[in-house]
């Protein structure tokens, strides 16, 4: 590939990735539909909302096998299939007439489709820009976050004008077209050349080799903690506002806006910063900010100011962590196997999405969950300040052994 074609291909891949990520991020408007689906099915909102828990779990599971899918079929085909399945999932959701069908369509199918496209396109795009990994991650994952914001207005308008069932059908058609079009612009990133230094050739870690390193599991704990804290606080922010900060319903609803802004800010600020300083130090900065937020929720007298500041801190760290982590994992274990190596760590997103709710259900109230998250953040901070990159797997070049 000529230099000019290489540049053209990678920028087209970036554009396709941004379009695809924007469409995939639309699933985070799900809370808009809980009330209408509850009324349609005659089921409690809590049971309807369980669909989103299944969606998050399915997203994490399919993300973990994205690397295998890319190896076999290529990024373009897998992304197209992701878009088609996502559109089908929304179409089936429109025609769901019981909870089980809703859980299978909106939960399992939509989650698996979304996850297959999300991590695959992200890791492929990052590999096209090895010199700007943090910035490219920020663009891609920032687009995913903006998708939830953009489709909030689209879906709200559709709900008001065409009703619940047609909204899901139109929504599915829009994301299908966007993702399939985005996929046509993408190409698989070329395999990265191994680095040579002082007569030594560094090799990428395979998934099996990575999982034998303690650093891999240290990173996994940090990622799980950030996801658990962010997803739990995002999920119950309005309830915390009313129960603990004693805000009225209208003021409490502003938590959604605060979280969206803080989440996006974390993605952009920490993502860009990760190209300037050591990425693990960026993670440490995010953890300190999240600790301040959790400490405020636990120990500070909560009013509107302290509450919004606290949840903003947690959301900022969550957004920044999921942006920086793909590049961080590639820094520790190499770029060529990034989709596989990060895919298993990304299971922490699905596990974290349900852990907070399970703890709250078992022990009741918010505070026990807050204390668990606070403890995990302290542990994660200790890990991020002590972790060191694994010894590079190296092979001496022929001339170096003579």
Name what the model sees in each region.
Residues 30-34, 208-268:
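Extracytoplasmic gate region of multi-pass secondary transporters
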Residues 37, 115-129, 136-137, 320-333:
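Intracellular juxtamembrane helix-capping segments at the cytosolic ends
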Residues 62-75, 267-278, 364:
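Helix-to-loop junctions at the C-terminal end of transmembrane segments
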Residues 77-91, 281-296:
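Structural signature of the two symmetry-related core transmembrane helices
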Residues 100-116, 224, 306-319:
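Hydrophobic core of transmembrane alpha-helices in multi-pass small-molecule transporters
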Residues 139, 143-188:
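Helix-loop-helix hairpin linking two adjacent transmembrane segments in secondary transporters
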Residues 148, 332-365:
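A late C-terminal transmembrane helix in Major Facilitator Superfamily
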Residues 172-197, 380-388:
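C-terminal membrane-cytosol helix-exit motif in multi-pass small-molecule transporters
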């Amino acid at each position: 590939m000529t230099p000019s074609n290489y540049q053209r291909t990678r920028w087209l891949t970036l554009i396709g990735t941004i379009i695809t990520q924007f469409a995939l991020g639309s699933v985070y408007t799900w809370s808009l539909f809980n009330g209408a689906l509850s009324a349609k099915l005659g089921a409690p909102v809590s049971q309807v909302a369980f669909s989103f828990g299944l969606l998050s779990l399915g997203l994490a599971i399919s993300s973990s096998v994205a690397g295998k899918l890319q190896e076999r079929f290529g990024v373009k085909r897998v992304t197209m299939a992701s878009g088609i399945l996502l559109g089908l999932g929304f179409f089936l959701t429109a025609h769901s007439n019981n909870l089980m069908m809703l859980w299978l369509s909106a939960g399992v199918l939509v989650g698996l489709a979304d996850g297959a496209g999300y991590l695959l396109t992200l890791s492929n795009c990052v590999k096209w820009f090895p010199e700007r990994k943090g910035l490219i991650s920020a663009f891609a994952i920032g687009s995913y976050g903006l998708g939830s914001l953009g489709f909030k207005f689209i879906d709200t308008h559709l709900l008001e004008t065409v009703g619940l069932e047609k909204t899901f059908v139109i929504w599915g058609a829009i994301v299908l077209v966007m993702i399939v079009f985005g996929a046509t612009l993408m190409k698989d990133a070329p395999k990265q050349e191994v680095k040579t230094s002082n007569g030594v050739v560094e090799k990428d870690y395979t998934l099996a080799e990575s999982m034998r390193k303690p650093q891999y599991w240290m990173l996994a704990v940090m990622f799980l903690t950030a996801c658990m804290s962010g997803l739990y606080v995002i999920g119950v922010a309005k309830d915390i506002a009313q129960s603990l900060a004693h805000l009225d319903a209208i003021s409490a609803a502003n938590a959604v806006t605060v979280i969206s802004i803080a989440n996006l800010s974390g993605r952009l600020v920490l993502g860009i910063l990760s190209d300037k300083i050591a990425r693990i130090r960026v993670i440490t900065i995010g953890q300190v900010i999240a600790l301040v937020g959790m400490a405020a929720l636990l120990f500070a007298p909560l009013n509107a100011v302290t509450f919004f500041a606290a949840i903003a801190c947690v959301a900022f760290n969550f957004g920044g962590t999921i942006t920086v982590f793909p590049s961080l994992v590639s820094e520790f274990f190499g770029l060529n196997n990034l989709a596989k190596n990060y895919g298993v760590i990304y299971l922490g997103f699905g596990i974290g999405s349900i852990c907070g709710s399970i703890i709250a259900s078992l022990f009741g109230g918010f505070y026990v969950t807050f204390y668990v998250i606070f403890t995990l953040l302290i542990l994660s901070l200790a890990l991020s300040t002590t972790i060191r990159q694994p010894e590079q797997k190296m092979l001496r070049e022929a001339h170096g052994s003579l």
